[in-house]
Amino acid sequence: MTDFHDKPNIQIMFDSLAPTYDKINGILSLGLHIAWNNALVSLLGETNHLLDLCAGTGRVALSYVQNYPRASATLVDFSTKMLENVQKRHPSAPFSYITSDVTHLPLPDNTFRLASMAYGLRNLSYPLEALREVYRVLQPGGHLGILELTRPATYNPVYLLHKLYLNLVVPSVGRFYSGNSYAYSYLKESIRDLPRDAALEAIFHAAHLRPIRKRKLLFGTATIWILEK
């Protein structure tokens, strides 16, 4: 399988979540998303200019320039409100901004040595098309780091706890803090419906991106892949 199921109009949904997105995700992950973002940044290593895809409110890009103070970043997201949130909160950050879908990047071929995509893969209706576009803008030998919320293996002792967490805690907390229970029901479903590792890695290979590192976080509730062009 190279495409995920049809997505609702998540651009409008993420626009509506922009004001509370960081706070809610911090609560839902018990603050672990900060450590996970830092792990992604560490595995990617240093470059002068990072391409941050599905950038959201810019947490990965901010972590990147804090860890590598000489770096700058281009943030790409299809949610105007998310990018406006970054600009408003961090006006002096060394960032440029592009409002665009990952499947149609207005960027030249072979431009970036490093790119990141955190919590965005499962929101793509056409991941193969998007990853081929990332391949196009990466330099030969360049790396894409993907951080995604995933499901523990069924034999994992935390599998049932994680399932209960997704079904009960995520929608309830999202509804309480954002007033948008649908959005966090979608989050639950997007994690549940994300293909398992073997299927995802087949998509990576189909896009000519070779997995060179993989790290499971918190019993497999999140996963980092480093892919090479």
UniProtKB/Swiss-Prot annotation:
Any Pfam family: Ubie_methyltran
Gene transcribed to yield this protein: menG
Alphabetic keyword roster: Menaquinone biosynthesis, Methyltransferase, S-adenosyl-L-methionine, Transferase
SUPFAM superfamilies named among the record's database cross-references: S-adenosyl-L-methionine-dependent methyltransferases
Superkingdom in the source lineage: Bacteria
UniProt pathway annotation: Quinol/quinone metabolism; menaquinone biosynthesis; menaquinol from 1,4-dihydroxy-2-naphthoate: step 2/2
Amino-acid positions noted as binding S-adenosyl-L-methionine in the UniProt annotation, renumbered to this chain: 57, 77, 101-102
Entry coiled-coil feature ranges: none
Gene Ontology terms describing biological process: menaquinone biosynthetic process; methylation
The EC number(s) this enzyme carries: 2.1.1.163
PANTHER family per UniProt: 2-METHOXY-6-POLYPRENYL-1,4-BENZOQUINOL METHYLASE, MITOCHONDRIAL, METHYLTRANSFERASE
Family the UniProt entry places it in: Belongs to the class I-like SAM-binding methyltransferase superfamily. MenG/UbiE family.
Catalytic activity: a 2-demethylmenaquinol + S-adenosyl-L-methionine = a menaquinol + S-adenosyl-L-homocysteine + H(+)
Function: Methyltransferase required for the conversion of demethylmenaquinol (DMKH2) to menaquinol (MKH2).
The species this protein was found in: Chlamydia trachomatis serovar L2 (strain ATCC VR-902B / DSM 19102 / 434/Bu)
Protein name in UniProt: Demethylmenaquinone methyltransferase
GO molecular function, one term: demethylmenaquinone methyltransferase activity
Keyword Signal set for record: no
Keyword Transferase appears in the UniProt entry: yes
